[in-house]
Amino acid sequence: MGSVPRVLEGERYDQFALESFVKSYWEENSIYRKVKEKSSRAPRKFYFLDGPPYASAKSIHIGTAWNKVVKDVVLRFYRMTGYNVWDKPGYDTHGLPIEVKIEQSLGVRVKREIEEKVGVENFIAACKRFVDENMEAMTRQFKEIGVFMDWENPYVTYRDEYIESGWWLVKKAWEKGLLYKGYRVLHWCPRCETTLADYEVSEYRELEDPSIYVKFPVEGREGEYLLVWTTTPWTLPANAFVMAHPDMEYVKVRVGRDTLILAKARLDHVMREAGVSEYEVLEVLKGSQLEGLRYRHPLEDVVDAQRELSKWHKVVMAPEAVTPHEGSGLVHSAPGHGTIDYEIAQRIGAPVVSLVDERGFMTEAAGKYSGLYFRGEANKAIVEDLRARGALFHAATIVHRYPVCWRCKTPLLLRATTQWFVAVTRLKNQLMREAEKVEWQPGWAKTRFMNMLRELRDWVISRQRYWGIPLPVWRCSSCGYEHVVGSVEELESMGGRRPENLHRPWVDRVELKCPRCGGSMKRVPDVLDVWFDSGIAFYASLGYPRDRETWERLKPVDFIVEGHDQIRGWFFSLLRSGVIGFGETPYRRVLVHGFALDEQGREMHKSLGNYVDFEELIAKVPRDVVRFWVLQNTVWEDLRFSWKGLDLMRRDFNVIWNVYAFASIYMGLDRFDPRRTSLSSVEDSLEVEDRWILSRLASLKRRYLTAMEDLRIHDAARALRSFIIEDVSHWYLRIIRRRVWEEVDTPSKRAAYATLYKVLWEWLLMAAPLIPYTAEYLYIKVFREAEERPEESIHMLDMPEPEDHLIDSTLEEDMEKARMVLEAILSARNEAGLKLRRPVRRVIIAASNPGVEGSLRRLEGLIRLMANAKEIEFAPASALEATRIYRVEPDYGRLGPKYKRDMPKVLRLIEEKGGEIGRVLAEKGVYEGEYEGLPVKLTLEDVSLKAEYPEWLKVRDTPLGLVAVDTRLTKEEVLEGLARDIVRRIQAMRKEAGYSVEDYVEVWIQGGEDVVEAVNALKEYIKRETRALKLEVGEPPSGVEVLREWELDGEKVVIALKRAAASG
């Protein structure tokens, strides 16, 4: 049978060394593979889908580490609760962020240089090399933080088989009539020369732009103008019409010689902003009265496009575009550069003209402004021309939030462009039905997700770039027919040759035979939206459609977790793909986590100097410490990084180590065998503290299992920490030390060992998913032998079963009250300068109600023991009140006018009978009496009343009532305290000398009368507590091994030790 080994005795705790040992152990013994093999035999499946981190850097962000730790905890928990866990990690490898990095490394300034100077083939190869290097570094870091996933077989979005899976979904959308090519206004990055979907427009900067009011002349009305406001002068050359609100009131205002038309609600603001103090309102009219009013464009003679657009120059009603809270109430509309403008133009049949090219420069149709960059050059030239023509009513600047490219940070523009779309708006009802089936944690994430679906727009899936899944659309150069290819086999069946790589430029060289006219078909040059890549991961990572069996066996995904930004990102992409391809949601449960920020709540960026490098972090802080610290944070709230917080958590690990070292050393010393001494065998010997900690353990198991199943990982982490630190270390171990230190084997000691063993073993099993290195080390070094387990890893074991029958809520509540009382006692002791080693005569408890008193009486013996008190006395509050000393200070300002010449008598009365007067005032609020023939009546307004307890009584007012400590010491109590102090010094010297806990010693003590008296009176107690075979008072002989001079209560004491001959 296996007794508990004493392996932790004398071992210097070093968490870094511990984790290094475990890491090597895992690698040398292929522990992950064995854990996975064991999990694969479980009957229930758990399909986890890894939201693939973006492989754009070699060092992972703290937030990415937190993300992977959360995933790892969930996977480890489900393995240990009987699930066959699918744990394939993934990497998101395509897209512009990577292209931008490669452009920078190659010195590429503009997009066309990729083809002209670098070559697409070389560019793609550089992207792949960059991604491969980053994946290798990231994988190493994920392993460092203890993440058990199938790192030998990750899914990688750039691989050909993954690309084919993407083509399958595009084909599916085409077959369902959902794929179409359309001309729409979309956000565009002029540096990257590609479009962005709405959900990609998530980054903004505070930028300065012009803020101008422009006069548009009304046709046929000399001197009358529509006053429009814009912050984008560069869109004015593409103006098609002006928008007004039909229900708003407008005014015609005389300003100098001009008559201006603008919204009544904006009049005062506009005039104040323009510095105009004199103006006259000529007429008030409804916006609907302006409908159809024609105007002339102030720049129509210098903009070629205006020749066609001038036919549409009139006021149209657009309540959705006009607000009384900004501008002039008249909005200039350029349908080629605004989404609402575009929709209104479609409604009224107006042309949609975009006068900005792919690189952000004005086109030839912009006339005079052709070749100017839209921001800066074009804005400046247009404002100057408007001023020169007298069309500029007022010009200023505005600082506002402006969208920038999430990849290169260039300011975006809206422009009309031809793109490929998936008509997900036609699936809106189905998407919302499927989304309702998903379980979200927390609940607000679902609300946000559903609100986003209500604002659904068609999915623009095409991008004008290189490093991405090529859009599988081939167009016939003869008849214009377009065909979507869903696989390489289909490519070959249409006369194409399988390219060596499915990326550009290889796939661009593949020509197909047109099934309609026999002509030659070439692929359209676009690639797919990078969100398409990760959005198909639920089936593409399994090899579908080539491998249909795995998806059919595993579907749906049981669990996904990512940051709350992915509500409109990855979670959305997955749902769209699931409904498009399979008609149903691909996932069942979603957990959302927060962002990792710095201590001030700012995002971490190298440019801000607040970025914490992962390698730096794990060089300074052990991995399990990092894990346990981040896991304490509420999962869906933002995490504020803190070196101090990590340092405090590191101290907790010292406590955890000491708890297990204590158990290992003393159980090993007494050769405790948990297989022989089961809890049931010592049930009759369990003390109240044993039953309490077992109840707390059972409560912990229930709370832990519920929290983990509900994905409230932070609750599980906090419960584990609180239990081992507060319940076990700070309370239970303090109580049972006296039982463990007994020299003889007693039923009480065996009961304490059996209880502590169960507590520490089951806590370790629950903690294993969260602190895998520490749990593995303690399992290998202590519990595997004690448990006689064949499993090589704790992560191959099962979670402990719930034991709700052990929960004693009454006892737990009683003990909580006892702990509160003890805190009050310790506080009172501290005030009196009485260390816990010094016994006190009595503790008086005046409970706030009979229920509290009942709880404390049930644990009276334990309170007396822990408080080191001779007696616990329960008394009413009035008993303590009776000990109070009242001091009365006269208020001369009140009493002087009241008693005048008799004031000296009143003062003598207060001096002589102040205590009595104070007590009466405290009880009744008024004192009445006679002194030297003078009737005296005093109230609380006449005096200042102070009530104090006597110096020897230290009182604490708690929610449970009053707790008082009688600090008067008898001679016996002083000697007991001295004896305890001597024991503590001897134990410190034993440790300093490196003695084993089982070594016996010989002790010599020199000191004053009290010390000598304490040693003689309590010699057997001191010998028992210090394992001393010999204890003598007097000068130590030569040959002692350690000698120290101490000061106890101001008295010098010399203590000398040497190992006794019986120590072996």
From Swiss-Prot:
Which top-rank group of organisms is this from? Archaea
The record's catalysed reaction(s) read: tRNA(Ile) + L-isoleucine + ATP = L-isoleucyl-tRNA(Ile) + AMP + diphosphate
Q: Per the UniProt record, which EC number(s) apply here?
A: 6.1.1.5
Gene Ontology CC entries for this record: cytoplasm
Main location per the UniProt record = cytoplasm
Motif 'KMSKS' region in this chain? 603-607
Q: Which GO terms describe its biological process?
A: isoleucyl-tRNA aminoacylation
Name where it's found.
Cytoplasm
Q: Does the keyword Metal-binding apply?
A: yes
Ranges spanned by the short sequence motif 'HIGH' region, renumbered to the chain: 53-64
InterPro entries under this entry? aa-tRNA-synth_Ia, Anticodon_Ile_ABEc, Ile-tRNA-ligase, Ile-tRNA-ligase_type2, M/V/L/I-tRNA-synth_anticd-bd, Rossmann-like_a/b/a_fold, tRNAsynth_Ia_anticodon-bd, Val/Leu/Ile-tRNA-synth_edit
Transmembrane segments annotated in the record for this chain = none
Keyword flag Metal-binding = yes
Give the protein's cofactors: Zn(2+)
Molecular function GO labels? aminoacyl-tRNA deacylase activity; ATP binding; isoleucine-tRNA ligase activity; tRNA binding; zinc ion binding
Alphabetically sorted, this entry's keywords are: Aminoacyl-tRNA synthetase, ATP-binding, Cytoplasm, Ligase, Metal-binding, Nucleotide-binding, Protein biosynthesis, Zinc
- Functional description taken from the UniProt entry: Catalyzes the attachment of isoleucine to tRNA(Ile). As IleRS can inadvertently accommodate and process structurally similar amino acids such as valine, to avoid such errors it has two additional distinct tRNA(Ile)-dependent editing activities. One activity is designated as 'pretransfer' editing and involves the hydrolysis of activated Val-AMP. The other activity is designated 'posttransfer' editing and involves deacylation of mischarged Val-tRNA(Ile).
- What family is reported? Belongs to the class-I aminoacyl-tRNA synthetase family. IleS type 2 subfamily.
Task: Please give the subunit comment from the record.
Answer: Monomer.
List the protein's name. Answer: Isoleucine--tRNA ligase
- Which gene does this sequence derive from? ileS
